[in-house]
């Protein structure tokens, strides 16, 4: 695409428009600047609310993929790519899953996480290559993330995913975007022009983060990774998380800190197993088998034991 054509294309994007509420932002003192930005930020959850049905549809597809050993792959450039990497990296400690289950790909590779490599997004071939490098398959789900909805790297990835029969999801902050047109599911929270024209790390980035949070959190809940609203598959990999594990057991069972700590040590800090042992008085092996029979769903394991 020529420079003139690119300028013309960008001029039609909502995310590249000038915001009439911040035209004088360069004249304002600090408090007024951040108040203007905050006023714009308040619009983000309202935009996300309008696309909840599409988000839920994507959650169902992701959950189905996980159940057959598939993966969730995020793909984006710049801020969009970093947000995908961030959400993916939080899944292992939060939900106790493999770091291969949710993967974030960013145009330009790992170096682009810390230092912008803006030109890397211009190659659709790179998107396809990055997916092939991780053995992307039809069992996986690809979420292409691009605030503009027209990033070549993401388009290339989505097109390749379509050719092999994988489920594709487009996350954009512009209506009727190119990536929305080629994906199975289009999630398009339109947040309007940014406080600083074209700086899509602002409202657009916030909207993307909210959506990604929902995709992984809701999918993991559907897989039994929570009990009530507690993170019962959390991995106690540092002192803070060891303390959190004990607190979760105490909250779920109303036991003492001493009992929670004792049982957690027996289970090698498997929170879900510790809770089941305390609530049912089962020994560790019986509790493990009972949990396995309920596909890892702690609530089902507790209730089925009570009914016997």
From Swiss-Prot:
GO process annotations (BP): 1,6-anhydro-N-acetyl-beta-muramic acid catabolic process; amino sugar catabolic process; N-acetylmuramic acid catabolic process; peptidoglycan turnover
Highest taxon of source: Bacteria
EC class (word): lyase
EC number, as in UniProt: 4.2.1.126
Name of the gene: murQ1
Assembly and interaction partners: Homodimer.
Keywords (A to Z) from UniProt: Carbohydrate metabolism, Lyase
Chain's role: Specifically catalyzes the cleavage of the D-lactyl ether substituent of MurNAc 6-phosphate, producing GlcNAc 6-phosphate and D-lactate. Together with AnmK, is also required for the utilization of anhydro-N-acetylmuramic acid (anhMurNAc) either imported from the medium or derived from its own cell wall murein, and thus plays a role in cell wall recycling.
Protein name: N-acetylmuramic acid 6-phosphate etherase 1
Database matches in InterPro entries: Etherase_MurQ, Glucokinase_regulatory_CS, MURQ/GCKR, SIS_dom, SIS_dom_sf
UniProt pathway annotation: Amino-sugar metabolism; 1,6-anhydro-N-acetylmuramate degradation; Amino-sugar metabolism; N-acetylmuramate degradation; Cell wall biogenesis; peptidoglycan recycling
Domain (SIS): residue spans on this chain: 62-225
Active site (record annotation): 90 (proton donor), 121
Disulfide bonds: none
Leftover remarks: A lyase-type mechanism (elimination/hydration) is suggested for the cleavage of the lactyl ether bond of MurNAc 6-phosphate, with the formation of an alpha,beta-unsaturated aldehyde intermediate with (E)-stereochemistry, followed by the syn addition of water to give product.
Family per record: Belongs to the GCKR-like family. MurNAc-6-P etherase subfamily.
Lineage: Bacteria, Pseudomonadati, Pseudomonadota, Gammaproteobacteria, Vibrionales
Protein's UniProt keywords contain Lyase: yes
Reaction it catalyzes: N-acetyl-D-muramate 6-phosphate + H2O = N-acetyl-D-glucosamine 6-phosphate + (R)-lactate
GO molecular function: carbohydrate derivative binding; carbon-oxygen lyase activity; ether hydrolase activity
One Pfam family cited in the UniProt record for this chain: GKRP_SIS_N
